[in-house]
């Protein structure tokens, strides 16, 4: 069994589990598992990098500002614009629509350190020039910042990943899954398919 210590407020609680399904970044997992992995595994984990993402949400009145759900952009501060009401009208407050601007960066770089106001000012210039929205129709804006959003495939990542997985596979009932947990660049449908496959394997093994 796995021993799982965690905090609930000021209280330290210890629990047990027969299986661990990890979706946290692999470097974080390597740092907390016991017994402590070899130094080579720690080094490989340090070599795995993730891209960060800032999602800048801009609320406007309820109008369809694009004839699609999302649009990829080049030479802009953001690389994708999503039209939230095109996904489902209940995802936005009543009477509003929301643009979601996806801004890719590295954790703690200059872009990450930009305030929401700075990101908005850099973006609204292009949104106006591209005739997507106008500044005067913006009701509010805010951001959500995701530190480890995408695996960053640097040269040598396969060798580093193989070193880590070779060690972790020695631990029975420890499963790594998801874009972050398995260091796989997957779309949401692939993540769901991967999870369904995991559940099917567990059922075939008779472990769930």
Model region roles, listed by residue range:
Residues 120-208:
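C-terminal catalytic lobe of FAD-dependent flavoproteins
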């Amino acid at each position: 069994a796995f021993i799982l210590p965690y905090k609930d407020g000021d209280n330290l609680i210890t629990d047990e589990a027969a299986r661990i399904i990890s979706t946290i970044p692999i470097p974080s997992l390597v740092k907390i598992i016991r017994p402590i992995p070899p130094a080579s595994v720690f080094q490989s984990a340090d070599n795995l990098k993730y891209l960060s993402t800032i999602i800048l949400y801009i609320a406007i009145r309820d109008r369809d500002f694009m004839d699609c759900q999302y649009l990829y952009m080049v030479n802009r501060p953001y690389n994708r614009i999503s039209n939230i009401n095109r996904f489902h009208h209940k995802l936005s407050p009543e009477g509003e629509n929301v643009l979601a601007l996806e801004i890719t960066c590295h954790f703690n770089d200059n872009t990450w350190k930009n305030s929401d106001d700075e990101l908005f000012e850099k973006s609204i210039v292009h949104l106006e020039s591209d005739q997507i929205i106008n500044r005067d129709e913006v009701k509010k804006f805010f951001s959500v910042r995701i530190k480890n959003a995408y695996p960053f495939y640097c040269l040598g990542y396969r060798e580093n990943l193989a070193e880590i997985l070779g060690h972790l596979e020695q631990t029975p009932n420890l499963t790594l899954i998801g874009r972050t947990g398995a260091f796989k660049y997957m779309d949401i449908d692939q993540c769901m398919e991967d999870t369904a496959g995991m559940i099917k394997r567990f059922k075939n093994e008779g472990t769930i």
